[in-house]
Amino acid sequence: MVRRLLALSRPLYWLYEKRLLREVKRGPMPRHLGLILDGNRRYARALGLSPTKGHEFGVQKAYEVLEWCLEMGIKTVTVWVFSTDNFKRPPEEVETLMNLFLREAERMAEDHRILEHQVRVRFIGRREGFSPEVVRAIERLERRTEGHRGMFLNIAMGYGGREEIVDAVKRLLLEAEARGLSPKEVAEGLTPEDIARHLYTAGLPDPDFIIRTSGEIRLSGFLLWQSAYSEFYFADVLWPEFRKIDFLRALRSYQARERRFGR
Protein backbone atom coordinates (compact mmCIF):
# COMPACT_ATOMS: atom_id res chain seq x y z
CA MET A 1 0.00 0.00 0.00
CA VAL A 2 2.78 2.42 0.96
CA ARG A 3 4.73 1.62 -2.21
CA ARG A 4 1.62 2.19 -4.30
CA LEU A 5 1.01 5.58 -2.69
CA LEU A 6 4.63 6.55 -3.28
CA ALA A 7 4.39 5.49 -6.91
CA LEU A 8 1.23 7.57 -7.37
CA SER A 9 2.80 10.63 -5.72
CA ARG A 10 5.90 10.71 -7.94
CA PRO A 11 4.18 12.22 -11.00
CA LEU A 12 2.58 14.90 -8.80
CA TYR A 13 5.96 15.68 -7.25
CA TRP A 14 7.55 15.92 -10.70
CA LEU A 15 4.80 18.22 -12.00
CA TYR A 16 5.09 20.47 -8.94
CA GLU A 17 8.87 20.68 -9.32
CA LYS A 18 8.54 21.61 -13.01
CA ARG A 19 5.97 24.30 -12.26
CA LEU A 20 8.08 25.70 -9.44
CA LEU A 21 11.16 25.69 -11.68
CA ARG A 22 9.36 27.71 -14.37
CA GLU A 23 8.13 30.19 -11.77
CA VAL A 24 11.53 30.71 -10.14
CA LYS A 25 13.40 30.99 -13.46
CA ARG A 26 11.33 34.08 -14.27
CA GLY A 27 12.60 35.93 -11.19
CA PRO A 28 15.94 37.48 -10.18
CA MET A 29 18.73 35.17 -9.06
CA PRO A 30 21.30 35.90 -6.38
CA ARG A 31 24.65 36.86 -7.85
CA HIS A 32 26.39 35.10 -4.97
CA LEU A 33 24.84 32.21 -3.05
CA GLY A 34 26.28 31.00 0.25
CA LEU A 35 25.58 27.45 1.44
CA ILE A 36 26.13 26.11 4.95
CA LEU A 37 26.07 22.33 4.51
CA ASP A 38 24.81 21.13 7.88
CA GLY A 39 23.39 17.81 9.01
CA ASN A 40 25.55 15.04 7.51
CA ARG A 41 26.28 13.35 10.83
CA ARG A 42 22.70 13.60 12.08
CA TYR A 43 21.47 12.09 8.83
CA ALA A 44 23.83 9.14 9.21
CA ARG A 45 22.91 8.70 12.86
CA ALA A 46 19.21 8.57 12.02
CA LEU A 47 19.94 5.73 9.58
CA GLY A 48 22.19 3.88 12.01
CA LEU A 49 25.26 4.58 9.87
CA SER A 50 28.72 5.94 10.64
CA PRO A 51 29.53 9.67 10.33
CA THR A 52 31.73 8.74 7.36
CA LYS A 53 28.68 7.57 5.42
CA GLY A 54 26.92 10.82 6.26
CA HIS A 55 29.79 12.84 4.83
CA GLU A 56 29.78 10.68 1.69
CA PHE A 57 26.09 11.42 1.20
CA GLY A 58 26.85 15.10 1.80
CA VAL A 59 29.50 15.16 -0.94
CA GLN A 60 27.11 13.71 -3.50
CA LYS A 61 24.45 16.23 -2.52
CA ALA A 62 26.96 19.06 -2.98
CA TYR A 63 27.59 17.99 -6.58
CA GLU A 64 23.85 17.80 -7.16
CA VAL A 65 23.21 21.28 -5.77
CA LEU A 66 26.11 22.66 -7.83
CA GLU A 67 24.31 21.40 -10.95
CA TRP A 68 21.12 23.17 -9.81
CA CYS A 69 23.08 26.41 -9.38
CA LEU A 70 24.49 26.05 -12.88
CA GLU A 71 20.99 25.43 -14.23
CA MET A 72 19.70 28.59 -12.52
CA GLY A 73 22.59 30.73 -13.76
CA ILE A 74 24.01 31.60 -10.33
CA LYS A 75 27.49 32.96 -11.00
CA THR A 76 29.18 32.72 -7.59
CA VAL A 77 28.66 30.01 -4.97
CA THR A 78 30.44 29.63 -1.64
CA VAL A 79 30.02 26.34 0.22
CA TRP A 80 31.20 25.85 3.79
CA VAL A 81 32.43 22.30 4.19
CA PHE A 82 34.82 22.43 7.18
CA SER A 83 35.28 25.06 9.88
CA THR A 84 38.28 25.82 12.05
CA ASP A 85 36.26 24.42 14.97
CA ASN A 86 35.80 21.11 13.13
CA PHE A 87 39.44 20.30 13.85
CA LYS A 88 38.25 19.66 17.43
CA ARG A 89 36.20 16.65 16.35
CA PRO A 90 37.43 13.11 17.13
CA PRO A 91 40.78 12.46 15.38
CA GLU A 92 39.42 9.50 13.42
CA GLU A 93 36.60 11.62 11.98
CA VAL A 94 39.00 14.45 11.06
CA GLU A 95 41.29 11.94 9.34
CA THR A 96 38.34 10.54 7.40
CA LEU A 97 37.39 14.04 6.28
CA MET A 98 40.95 14.79 5.21
CA ASN A 99 40.96 11.67 3.04
CA LEU A 100 37.61 12.73 1.61
CA PHE A 101 38.91 16.22 0.80
CA LEU A 102 41.97 14.74 -0.90
CA ARG A 103 39.90 12.35 -2.99
CA GLU A 104 37.37 14.98 -4.06
CA ALA A 105 39.98 17.64 -4.88
CA GLU A 106 41.71 15.15 -7.18
CA ARG A 107 38.39 14.09 -8.70
CA MET A 108 37.19 17.66 -9.29
CA ALA A 109 40.34 18.49 -11.24
CA GLU A 110 39.12 16.02 -13.89
CA ASP A 111 35.34 16.33 -13.39
CA HIS A 112 33.56 16.94 -16.70
CA ARG A 113 31.02 19.24 -15.01
CA ILE A 114 33.77 21.50 -13.72
CA LEU A 115 35.54 21.57 -17.07
CA GLU A 116 32.52 21.81 -19.39
CA HIS A 117 30.86 24.59 -17.39
CA GLN A 118 34.14 26.46 -16.86
CA VAL A 119 33.82 26.44 -13.05
CA ARG A 120 36.67 28.19 -11.31
CA VAL A 121 37.35 26.56 -7.94
CA ARG A 122 39.03 28.39 -5.07
CA PHE A 123 39.58 27.23 -1.51
CA ILE A 124 39.18 29.86 1.20
CA GLY A 125 40.35 29.44 4.77
CA ARG A 126 43.49 28.55 6.67
CA ARG A 127 45.46 25.67 5.24
CA GLU A 128 47.91 25.13 8.09
CA GLY A 129 45.92 22.26 9.61
CA PHE A 130 45.77 20.23 6.40
CA SER A 131 48.28 17.62 5.30
CA PRO A 132 50.76 18.46 2.52
CA GLU A 133 48.92 15.98 0.27
CA VAL A 134 45.60 17.80 0.72
CA VAL A 135 47.21 21.21 0.19
CA ARG A 136 48.92 20.03 -3.01
CA ALA A 137 45.64 18.61 -4.32
CA ILE A 138 43.64 21.78 -3.71
CA GLU A 139 46.41 23.96 -5.17
CA ARG A 140 46.46 21.75 -8.28
CA LEU A 141 42.68 22.11 -8.62
CA GLU A 142 42.94 25.89 -8.26
CA ARG A 143 45.63 26.05 -10.95
CA ARG A 144 43.64 23.70 -13.21
CA THR A 145 40.61 26.00 -13.14
CA GLU A 146 42.12 29.46 -12.69
CA GLY A 147 41.28 30.47 -16.26
CA HIS A 148 37.63 29.42 -16.01
CA ARG A 149 34.95 32.12 -16.08
CA GLY A 150 31.65 30.23 -16.10
CA MET A 151 31.09 30.11 -12.33
CA PHE A 152 33.16 30.96 -9.27
CA LEU A 153 32.98 28.17 -6.68
CA ASN A 154 34.55 29.00 -3.32
CA ILE A 155 35.03 26.02 -1.01
CA ALA A 156 35.39 27.23 2.57
CA MET A 157 37.67 24.71 4.26
CA GLY A 158 39.51 25.40 7.50
CA TYR A 159 37.33 28.49 7.51
CA GLY A 160 36.13 30.73 10.33
CA GLY A 161 34.59 34.16 9.89
CA ARG A 162 36.54 35.73 12.74
CA GLU A 163 39.77 34.20 11.48
CA GLU A 164 39.10 35.62 8.02
CA ILE A 165 38.77 39.14 9.41
CA VAL A 166 41.93 38.72 11.52
CA ASP A 167 43.83 37.47 8.47
CA ALA A 168 42.56 40.42 6.41
CA VAL A 169 43.77 42.91 9.01
CA LYS A 170 47.15 41.16 9.23
CA ARG A 171 47.60 41.35 5.46
CA LEU A 172 46.56 44.99 5.44
CA LEU A 173 49.05 45.89 8.18
CA LEU A 174 51.90 44.00 6.53
CA GLU A 175 51.14 45.71 3.24
CA ALA A 176 51.08 49.12 4.95
CA GLU A 177 54.39 48.38 6.68
CA ALA A 178 55.96 47.48 3.33
CA ARG A 179 54.83 50.87 2.03
CA GLY A 180 56.45 52.61 5.01
CA LEU A 181 53.19 53.70 6.70
CA SER A 182 53.01 54.15 10.47
CA PRO A 183 50.23 52.52 12.56
CA LYS A 184 48.74 55.97 13.08
CA GLU A 185 48.62 56.62 9.34
CA VAL A 186 46.97 53.25 8.78
CA ALA A 187 44.36 53.88 11.48
CA GLU A 188 43.51 57.35 10.23
CA GLY A 189 42.99 56.21 6.65
CA LEU A 190 41.34 52.84 7.31
CA THR A 191 37.98 52.21 5.61
CA PRO A 192 35.62 49.21 5.34
CA GLU A 193 36.69 48.92 1.70
CA ASP A 194 40.30 48.44 2.83
CA ILE A 195 39.26 45.44 4.93
CA ALA A 196 37.08 44.04 2.13
CA ARG A 197 40.00 44.13 -0.31
CA HIS A 198 41.97 41.79 1.93
CA LEU A 199 39.25 39.21 2.65
CA TYR A 200 39.43 35.69 1.20
CA THR A 201 36.60 36.64 -1.20
CA ALA A 202 38.16 39.90 -2.41
CA GLY A 203 37.06 40.77 -5.92
CA LEU A 204 33.78 38.87 -5.69
CA PRO A 205 30.34 40.29 -4.84
CA ASP A 206 29.10 39.85 -1.28
CA PRO A 207 26.56 37.03 -0.88
CA ASP A 208 23.02 38.11 -1.68
CA PHE A 209 21.53 34.96 -0.21
CA ILE A 210 22.68 32.37 2.33
CA ILE A 211 20.99 29.00 2.84
CA ARG A 212 21.64 26.82 5.87
CA THR A 213 20.24 23.32 6.17
CA SER A 214 19.42 21.21 9.27
CA GLY A 215 17.03 23.69 10.92
CA GLU A 216 19.76 25.49 12.87
CA ILE A 217 19.02 29.23 12.86
CA ARG A 218 22.48 30.79 13.03
CA LEU A 219 25.43 31.59 10.78
CA SER A 220 28.12 30.12 13.07
CA GLY A 221 30.63 32.64 11.70
CA PHE A 222 30.02 32.09 7.98
CA LEU A 223 31.11 35.10 5.87
CA LEU A 224 30.67 37.41 8.85
CA TRP A 225 31.91 40.55 7.13
CA GLN A 226 30.35 39.88 3.73
CA SER A 227 26.87 38.94 4.99
CA ALA A 228 25.95 42.38 6.40
CA TYR A 229 23.14 42.78 3.85
CA SER A 230 22.56 39.15 2.91
CA GLU A 231 19.16 37.51 2.97
CA PHE A 232 18.96 34.26 4.95
CA TYR A 233 16.99 31.06 4.56
CA PHE A 234 17.04 28.25 7.12
CA ALA A 235 15.82 24.97 5.65
CA ASP A 236 14.44 22.47 8.15
CA VAL A 237 16.01 19.47 6.40
CA LEU A 238 19.40 17.83 6.82
CA TRP A 239 21.89 18.50 4.04
CA PRO A 240 21.77 15.02 2.41
CA GLU A 241 17.94 15.31 2.33
CA PHE A 242 17.93 18.73 0.63
CA ARG A 243 15.79 18.32 -2.49
CA LYS A 244 15.53 20.42 -5.62
CA ILE A 245 12.09 21.49 -4.44
CA ASP A 246 13.67 22.78 -1.21
CA PHE A 247 16.24 24.68 -3.26
CA LEU A 248 13.60 26.22 -5.51
CA ARG A 249 11.43 27.18 -2.54
CA ALA A 250 14.42 28.92 -1.00
CA LEU A 251 15.02 30.88 -4.22
CA ARG A 252 11.33 31.76 -4.41
CA SER A 253 11.54 33.11 -0.87
CA TYR A 254 14.55 35.22 -1.87
CA GLN A 255 12.73 36.60 -4.90
CA ALA A 256 9.77 37.66 -2.76
CA ARG A 257 11.90 39.86 -0.49
CA GLU A 258 12.58 43.56 -0.87
CA ARG A 259 16.26 44.24 -0.28
CA ARG A 260 16.85 47.70 1.21
CA PHE A 261 20.58 47.54 2.08
CA GLY A 262 19.99 49.58 5.24
CA ARG A 263 18.10 52.35 3.42
UniProtKB/Swiss-Prot annotation:
CDD domains: Cis_IPPS. One of its GO terms (biological process) is polyprenol biosynthetic process. The active site is at D38, N86 (proton acceptor). It is an enzyme of class 2 (transferase). GO terms for molecular function: ditrans,polycis-polyprenyl diphosphate synthase [(2E,6E)-farnesyl diphosphate specific] activity; magnesium ion binding. Mg(2+) binds at D38, E231. Disulfide bonds: none annotated. Its EC number is 2.5.1.-. InterPro entries: UPP_synth-like (IPR001441), UPP_synth-like_CS (IPR018520), UPP_synth-like_sf (IPR036424). Its cofactor is Mg(2+). Substrate binds at G39, N40, R41, R42, H55, S83, T84, D85, F87, R89, R212, R218, L219, S220. It comes from the Bacteria. Keywords: Magnesium, Metal-binding, Transferase. Binds 2 magnesium ions per subunit. Coiled coil: none annotated. Belongs to the UPP synthase family. Homodimer. Catalyzes the condensation of isopentenyl diphosphate (IPP) with allylic pyrophosphates generating different type of terpenoids. This is Isoprenyl transferase.
